[in-house]
């Protein structure tokens, strides 16, 4: 507990970039030792390896951060911790089992994270389910099916507490009695958006709300990017349900790809604006999401061979679509074989170019059938 105030101080310290803070931590045992170190010690550590190491260390050139160091104080950090203690907000440092591997693997992650609620065993896989704030009925259906399956497999579901797919992911997880983590772009003094305050509180009953920002920090645009980076780093797998080309979900997905994470995207019609980003992700190296049974470990080549009853169901769907386009719920009444879900039929048939989902929210036959 004594070290927490020093972790917060170093994390919030302005005038010293993250790279420099990490270098100090590599050379000194903890942030308390950094706080009490002399300017000469700090200067020498940060100058080591540079062409000017000797002259800087000898003081022939005043470091740019001299004023920052001479004016250092724990006052701001103590105020933050006081508020955190009042609101049951906890701190994660690189020494914590939930954060040490993530911190070591990604040089751009912050020194500390803050959270409310409870964190599960760090060995349990975490799957991020993200997507458009203005999702389609198709996206909602796929998100619910995927989350239900993932929770059943024992995964923790992570998302961003926003409208649309994020909220669906959190709510579906809770409905399935699973654990969900919400990553937010502000301090934990409020929910973002405010209308999700009740959802935020519900999440903390069994899961956690996590942020890289201290109490009182508001959700400014650049903080959404920081939140997305932490979400991408925390997750083992990221599933993008629907996303436009320029969106926060695309930012998160691309961040995850750069970190070498397993990224999946739902293929959809090129005529559907809400899926322009997910289709682009497939071109950038994401794996195609086919159905909930193939989500984590199967490939497109492993589609099951349809049995007789399954073939009958497909034929019934095709026959129904010949009379006109139908919604997913309307098609569900034609599925006889309940070993497979309606979305599995539709996904397989879409991949076989038998049907397509269009922007009107309905399934259409591909010409010639």
Labelled PLM ranges:
Residues 1-98, 352-369:
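Short, small/acidic-rich helices and loops at N termini and domain boundaries
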Residues 1-4, 93-369:
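Glycine-biased, small-residue-rich flexible motifs in mid-sequence functional cores and linkers
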């Amino acid at each position: 507990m004594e070290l927490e105030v020093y972790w917060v101080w170093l994390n919030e310290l302005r005038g010293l970039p993250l790279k420099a803070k990490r270098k100090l931590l590599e050379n000194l045992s903890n942030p308390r030792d950094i706080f009490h170190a002399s300017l000469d010690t700090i200067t020498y550590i940060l100058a080591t390896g540079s062409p000017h190491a000797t002259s800087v260390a000898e003081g022939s050139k005043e470091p740019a951060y001299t004023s920052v160091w001479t004016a250092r104080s724990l006052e701001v950090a103590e105020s933050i911790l006081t508020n955190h203690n009042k609101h049951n907000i906890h701190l994660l440092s690189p020494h914590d089992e939930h954060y040490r591997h993530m911190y070591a693997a990604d040089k751009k992650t912050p020194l500390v994270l803050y959270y409310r609620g409870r964190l599960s065993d760090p060995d349990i896989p975490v799957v991020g389910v993200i997507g458009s704030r203005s999702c389609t009925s198709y996206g909602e259906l796929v998100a619910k099916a995927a989350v239900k399956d993932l929770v059943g497999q024992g995964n923790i579901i992570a998302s961003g507490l926003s409208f649309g797919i994020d909220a669906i992911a959190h709510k579906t997880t809770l409905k399935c009695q699973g654990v969900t983590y919400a990553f937010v772009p502000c301090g934990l003094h409020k929910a973002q958006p405010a209308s999700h305050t009740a959802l935020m509180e519900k999440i903390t009953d069994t899961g956690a709300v996590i942020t890289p920002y201290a109490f009182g920090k508001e959700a400014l645009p650049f903080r959404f990017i920081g939140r997305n980076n932490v979400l991408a780093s925390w997750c083992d797998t990221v599933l993008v349900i629907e996303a436009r080309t320029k969106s926060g979900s695309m930012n998160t997905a691309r961040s995850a790809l750069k970190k070498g994470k397993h990224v999946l995207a739902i293929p959809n019609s090129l005529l559907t604006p809400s899926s322009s980003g997910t289709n682009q992700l497939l071109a950038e190296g994401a794996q195609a999401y086919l159905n909930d049974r193939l989500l984590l470990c199967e490939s497109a080549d492993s589609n099951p061979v349809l049995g007789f009853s399954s073939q009958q169901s497909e034929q019934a769907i095709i026959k129904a679509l010949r009379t006109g386009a139908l919604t997913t719920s309307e098609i569900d009444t034609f599925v006889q074989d309940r070993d497979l879900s309606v979305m599995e039929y539709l996904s397989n048939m879409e991949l076989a170019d038998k049907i397509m989902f269009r922007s009107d929210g309905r399934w259409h036959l591909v010409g010639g059938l």
